[in-house]
């Protein structure tokens, strides 16, 4: 966003994502709970973040870890009570922390009363979901579910198919029905009245479906031929988001962030440009597909570094020019750990964790830190299918075996790509179960918890934790991190990512070595002679001679001049 935009509180903030199920258990059930979040608020305050985004804790059968909501108005007993939630909200506010809730309004659980009534053809709810008759005795279209298989499920009770873009127990809501929208807006207002500070909208750009319900013949090469061209950034999406903004948020100062699946930059500009009155910011995932050769996620592959830089640059420049606003991130509950993916989680654990943090926090947008990222948690490298819990992973494992993969090959792919990689318990200390629970954890604790944990990080002034703390402080003090124009530099370089944040009278220069070997980088055009170092991930500064900087493995520096 250009420098003359009206700054809101979230432009300077850093958001911390909590996946409550794996955060902290206070009851011995083996699953994290709301009291566990309350217990750790002081730790989060120490880190310096201002906003906590909580993934869903609503009543749910937990087929997709809470993204299948059966009751939007109540807290799932496994997390605690509404009183626990209100206490946590109150304690967070006392500490100056804001709470953003995750809400799923593209679909609900098939256990939801709305779905049950719709399936039974209750007149008020009959068209609350997307029901279709068979076509030629089979599914209405060839659209595929994001979790594998066809996206339509037959209901014996109703005698029709319903659409589920995700799990078979997650039925898509019919946004064409005005009463559905009214019910959803009413529900969001209920949580706002409790005092929450904003919402993260799950897969929000999928809510508008092309009402022709056509088969995907693969002719639109912009999209994977699985039907997504007919429901991604659909025909009425901007109309629906404008209505949501008008009916629920108005002129309030709330943070609204949309998760955008397979989106295009033109749409994200529109979604997040304040003049459009839709959302405050957007997540996009193109940079996290650079290890999907030919768009295929479920293969073992290295990441394409130059492509990663080009995608980040495209979004930085495009969103700035279009007055949009990025939510920037490496990690979330659906992605493997970035440290294992883009860094070196063994030989250069701390150096590469700090480097990735520096790169991200130097970009324009609101940075998001995912639990465990701030002290260097890694993928768990689970070597048996029995250790995996995620519905996507267990489904894909069977599909990979059917495709001819050996069990060992399938597990190696899951070790790299599974969503469970980021869902293991937060490693609080070196005691049993990493201090997460006194019971049996719902998913195994990674074996490296004795070396990598919060307690150890807090005791080491040079730890990854304090590097994150310094980056967050820097964001508050350096206006250029908010308003500076992004310019990339030597984008084809195969080892180094270098970019500037340019203001009227000053600029920041971020230079990062993405690999485990020392390398040289030509800085002649960057004129670093009079530049000062604001932050580095090595105690000893870099060597610069003959217009070249010598970068140590995973070295990352922010210069100011």
Write out the residue ranges for each language-model feature.
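Active-site and adjacent substrate-binding regions of carbohydrate-active enzymes
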Residues: 1-561
């Amino acid at each position: 966003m250009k420098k003359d935009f009206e700054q809101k509180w979230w432009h300077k903030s850093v958001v911390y994502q909590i996946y409550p199920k794996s955060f902290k258990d206070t009851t011995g059930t083996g699953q994290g709970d709301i009291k566990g979040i309350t217990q750790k608020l002081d730790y989060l305050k120490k880190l310096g973040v201002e906003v906590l985004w909580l993934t869903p804790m609503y009543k749910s059968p937990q087929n997709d870890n809470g993204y299948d909501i059966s009751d939007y108005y109540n807290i799932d007993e496994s997390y605690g009570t509404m009183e626990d939630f209100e206490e946590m909200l109150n304690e967070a506010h006392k500490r100056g922390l804001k709470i953003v809730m995750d809400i799923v309004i593209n679909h609900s659980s098939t256990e939801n009363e709305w779905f049950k009534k719709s399936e039974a053809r209750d007149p008020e709810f009959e068209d609350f979901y997307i029901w279709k008759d068979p076509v030629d005795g089979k599914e209405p279209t060839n659209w595929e579910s994001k979790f594998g298989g066809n996206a339509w499920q037959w209901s014996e009770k109703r005698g029709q198919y319903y659409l589920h873009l995700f799990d078979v127990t997650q039925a898509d809501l019919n946004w064409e029905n005005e009463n559905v929208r009214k019910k959803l807006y009413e529900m969001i207002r209920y949580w706002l009245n409790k005092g929450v500070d904003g919402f993260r909208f799950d897969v929000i750009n999928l809510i508008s479906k092309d009402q022709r319900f056509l088969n995907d013949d693969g002719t639109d090469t912009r999209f994977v031929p699985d039907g997504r061209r007919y429901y991604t950034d659909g025909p009425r999406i901007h109309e629906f988001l404008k209505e949501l903004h008008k009916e629920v948020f108005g002129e309030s100062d709330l943070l609204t962030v949309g998760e955008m699946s397979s989106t295009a930059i033109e749409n994200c500009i529109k979604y997040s440009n304040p003049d459009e009155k839709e959302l405050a910011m957007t997540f996009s995932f193109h940079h996290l597909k650079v290890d999907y050769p030919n768009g295929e996620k479920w293969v073992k592959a290295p990441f394409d570094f130059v492509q990663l830089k080009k995608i980040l640059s495209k979004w930085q420049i495009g969103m700035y020019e279009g007055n949009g606003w990025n939510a920037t991130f490496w990690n979330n509950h659906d992605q493997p750990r970035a440290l294992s993916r883009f860094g070196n989680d063994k030989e250069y654990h701390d150096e590469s964790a700090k480097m990735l943090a520096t790169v991200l926090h130097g970009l324009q947008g609101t940075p998001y830190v995912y639990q465990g990222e701030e002290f260097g948690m890694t993928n768990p490298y689970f070597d048996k299918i029995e250790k995996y819990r995620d519905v996507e992973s267990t489904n894909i494992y069977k599909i990979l075996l059917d495709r001819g993969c050996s069990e060992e090959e399938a597990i190696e792919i899951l070790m790299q790509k599974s969503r469970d990689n980021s869902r293991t318990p937060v490693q609080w200390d070196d005691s049993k179960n990493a201090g997460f629970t006194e019971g049996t954890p719902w998913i195994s604790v990674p074996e490296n918890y004795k070396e990598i944990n919060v307690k150890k990080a807090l005791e080491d002034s040079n730890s990854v934790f304090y590097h994150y703390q310094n980056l967050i402080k820097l964001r508050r003090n350096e206006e250029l991190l908010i308003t500076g124009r992004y310019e990339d530099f030597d984008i084809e370089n195969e080892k180094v990512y270098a970019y500037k944040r340019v203001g009227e009278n000053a600029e920041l220069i971020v230079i990062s070595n993405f690999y485990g070997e020392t390398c040289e980088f030509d800085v002649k055009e960057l004129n670093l002679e009079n530049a000062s170092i604001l932050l580095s991930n090595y105690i000893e500064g870099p060597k610069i001679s003959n217009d070249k900087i010598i970068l140590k493995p995973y070295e990352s520096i922010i210069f100011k001049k």
